[in-house]
Amino acid sequence: MEEAGETMEVAPAPVLVRLPPHLVVLFPGADRLVSVQATSVAEMVDGLDALWPGMRERICDETPAIRRHINVFVAGRRARLTTPLAPGADVFVITAISGG
């Protein structure tokens, strides 16, 4: 039973992450579809970086925030590092494409 003022900690649960081909090719052995344990987008990035060191630097800048040319979507909505993830969430990481 929770006491007044106490918060219950949520245990990380599996979320499904879909990575773009432009990012996956930089990490030999990386999959486009991966399951990681996370309760937020920041924890998801940590999980990806644990699997493939250097992934965090490709997704996030030094502030830290998601890089300008990377978009993360959860349930069809653009997400930030602080966005919470429900168990079984489907997360899409998308790179911006530009050209002239």
Language model regions located:
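Ubiquitin-like/PB1-type beta-grasp interaction modules and other compact soluble beta-rich domains
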Residues: 1-99
